[in-house]
């Protein structure tokens, strides 16, 4: 699980503080025995119950999907280890094999609810045969629709400059705001690629199988040149079970403006088209 036995009291007290509970009448140590599969299935309902409590008791001032996403991320942050702990564990698993390291990190990203399993499962996916071969088609339904109240609030909200974008390293542990998602349950793995600092993370929206992103520590516009291919090869040397590709070095890609050099990666259950 996310919480070791040594951290149970500490974690309980963090949750009590978050929910403004001064007394704990049920007594510490009362546990529900359940399998991992049952725990995964139970998580969204449990978070909903906790958020309902927060709304009813004035802890969560506004209700709605955006506000609930901000708050349930705060709940999960109480259960997530510090970045250094996750990085250390990742490297321990890498000593076994690259696959063991990414298996650990992907499952961790799901268990922390950074990747929301119960939303990702709504995505539509199918394979269509074409004269060029089988084509994987996906319709991503993981991103929640904002309610009108949240849209209006986001329009009026001050446009902050921190973090600089949705992908940069400063998002790790960020509390979020009405116009920027919370990332308190998010962890990033630092890498050295082409003698420069890069960072490895999974995408919360899973556009591809085990969809992850490697990005530069600096906000450098995306450029495709000789060094791009060197970076791609270096990464596949580190993680030979993944396939990857860079974004196009165009001013606007996928309807958004990219101010960060990044690479998309996927675990290829089939040959995949990577943007």
Please name every model-derived segment:
Residues 1-224, 275:
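Active-site microenvironments that recognize anionic phosphate/pyrophosphate groups
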């Amino acid at each position: 699980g996310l919480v070791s036995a040594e951290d149970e009291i500490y974690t309980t007290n963090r949750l009590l503080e978050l929910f403004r509970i001064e007394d704990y009448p049920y007594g510490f140590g009362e546990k529900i025995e359940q399998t991992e599969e049952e725990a995964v299935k139970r998580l969204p309902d449990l978070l909903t119950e906790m958020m309902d409590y927060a709304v009813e008791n004035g802890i969560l001032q506004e209700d709605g999907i955006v506000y609930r996403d901000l708050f349930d991320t705060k709940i999960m942050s109480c259960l997530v280890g510090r970045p250094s702990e996750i990085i250390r564990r990742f490297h321990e698993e890498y000593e076994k094999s690259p696959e063991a390291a990414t298996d650990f990190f992907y499952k961790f990203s799901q268990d922390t609810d950074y990747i929301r399993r119960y939303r990702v499962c709504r995505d539509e996916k199918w394979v269509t045969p074409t004269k060029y071969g089988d084509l994987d088609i996906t319709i991503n339904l993981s991103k929640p629709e904002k309610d009108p109240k949240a849209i209006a609030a986001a329009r009026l909200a001050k446009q902050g400059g921190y973090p600089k974008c949705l992908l940069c390293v400063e998002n790790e542990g960020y509390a979020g705001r009405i116009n920027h998602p919370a990332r308190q349950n998010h962890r990033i793995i630092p890498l050295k690629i082409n003698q420069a600092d890069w960072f490895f993370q999974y995408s919360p929206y899973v556009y591809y199988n085990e969809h992850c992103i490697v990005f530069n520590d600096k906000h450098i516009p995306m450029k495709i040149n000789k060094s791009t291919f060197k970076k791609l090869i270096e990464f596949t040397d580190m993680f030979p079970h993944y396939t990857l590709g860079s974004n196009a070095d165009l001013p606007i890609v996928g309807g958004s403006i990219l101010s960060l050099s990044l690479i998309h990666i996927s675990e290829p259950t089939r040959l995949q088209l990577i943007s």
